[in-house]
UniProtKB/Swiss-Prot annotation:
Residues bearing carbohydrate: 52, 97, 149, 170, 186
Residue stretches making up the FZ domain: 25-154
Keyword presence, Membrane: yes
Cytoplasmic compartment residues: 258-264, 330-349, 413-434, 512-580
Membrane topology of the entry: Multi-pass membrane protein
Name of the molecule in the record: Frizzled and smoothened-like protein K
Free-text comment on this protein's domains from its UniProt entry: Lys-Thr-X-X-X-Trp motif interacts with the PDZ domain of Dvl (Disheveled) family members and is involved in the activation of the Wnt/beta-catenin signaling pathway.
Organism: Dictyostelium discoideum (Social amoeba)
Sequence ranges on the Extracellular membrane side: 19-236, 286-308, 371-391, 456-490
Membrane-spanning residues: 237-257, 265-285, 309-329, 350-370, 392-412, 435-455, 491-511
Amino acid sequence: MRVLFILFLFYFYTYTEAQQYYPIDPTGKCEQYIGDSVITPCNSIYVSSTANQSTAMLSLNLYFSLLGGSSASCQNAYTFATLCSTYLPECEIFIDNSTNKEIAMPKRVCLDTCNSVSKNCQITSYFDCNQLEPISKLPLFPKESSDYNLTTYGGELNYRLDCYDPPKSNETTVIGYCPFPLVFRNRTIVGKGSDSLDNSENYGYTYVSEDSYCTIPCPAPIFSEKQWDNIFDTSDAISLVSLLCSVYLFITYMVINPKRNKYDYFFSFFVLSIILMSIAGTIGFSVGGTRKLLCPEINRRGVYTDPAVAAAGWIFQFAIINAILWFSINSFELWFQIKFIKRKLHLIKFYILAVLVISIALSVPLSAIGEFNAGLGNFVVWIESGKYQNWFFWGPLGIVLTVGTTFIGLVIWEIYKIVSSTNKSDFFKLQLKPLMNMLLIYLTFVYLFGYNFYIHNSLNGFYGSSEEFKNCIISTDGKDCRIQGPPYSSILMFVFCLRIYGVYCIALYGFSPKTRSIWSNSIVFNNSMANKLKTLYISSGTTKGGTSSTDIKMSTNNNSNMDSGGGKSSSMEPDEIILR
């Protein structure tokens, strides 16, 4: 008997020592819910002496912002009841019969409930359900219950308060909030992908997941707003300047040029392509600028159903295919004229037909299937699908670059052979401008080609930064949070290469002797009104060194006759491929 008694005492002592009780805060109390957050109102909230509902809501709203960007399956009554009960726990009251004092105790959320919600909402990396309370070092989320010792208050030694497990409910509860810079947009979700009732992707809304209510802003937070404005403004400015320059050159070589040769036609058709590319770049002015064209709403990118977007995309694709084809034709013709000096090609009608057919074939189908859309992280309306980009642009561009590279190399080789054998340095100077034009355009096309492959090869790295972006927006105000993307300088260079062609051409041809000759002999400066103004200007002038105004007029007329008579015609200017 003595041995059994000793064993009983040992067991009792061990059990009572091992039993751990949650502490009771004598100043803790039950309060009515103040209702400042976006949760279902509660009748009674437990508040300890070291906290209040307002401070608890700061933490609560942090997780609401996190859940706002989560899937719809996470946004249900079960999830929100669990989250609310974690920071604003339900209050349980025990009355001390000897003093009639109310003892408040929190009803903690069950561990399995916490684990289920954090796993379903994919926030296990942000919230630890196994954490301990700071003072008692007991689980914040008990497995079954919280045990209290209420003997001091006239109660039981092992007062058991079951943990809280809200009723299971799959009813969706949309909180209408997303962490900045994400933008909330309500929608009815039936399933995934094409099962969504509003088919939002076709309207330009991009959600962070298939069943989320948070949309990515437009433009995407790859750069700061100031940097995006700079990109858009740069694109607008260069496009406008390029448009004016190319229109001037087209008028010069195609409209007022009285003696057009086939090289003038080649150059004019290339310039016409640049005009169309520039129009595509300036079409945003019709809707308030490039930003408004690409992003009609703060969370919507422009798509093919927007008339201005569809027009800009089609014109750009048609024009840039035209441009690279005429570039290839020019390089071939330049090589052929140098290689076979006395032989002439008369293929201009064939060239025009071939360029039109190819350009239409590579642009119209894309418009029919709605591929011309604005990108969230781009400054141009273009082909959206990488597959169609490769088929309808990068593939043809690769072929053209190969052809262009071959003929440019052959041109340089032929010039080298001629200069080396004949010592005609003036021949090299003669071909310098067309060669420079080919090289500049070639280099910009090469950059576009290489940049595309850089972007595609870096996509995994860009997408891999989404976790860092998510951590940033839930822990800060989101203003400085960025999704990793291409360097800012590379985007500016891409803008430059796409929009600069008109400036290239006018720098090489806009003020050449041939251009000046075309304008001086054109109807613009040779009509009755212009002649009267010239006569008036000359007759009103004073002479220097005894020369009369009549002498000046006669000298001018003689020079004019020499330019239009037996001298070289405007078609024999140094811009042509002619041996001297």
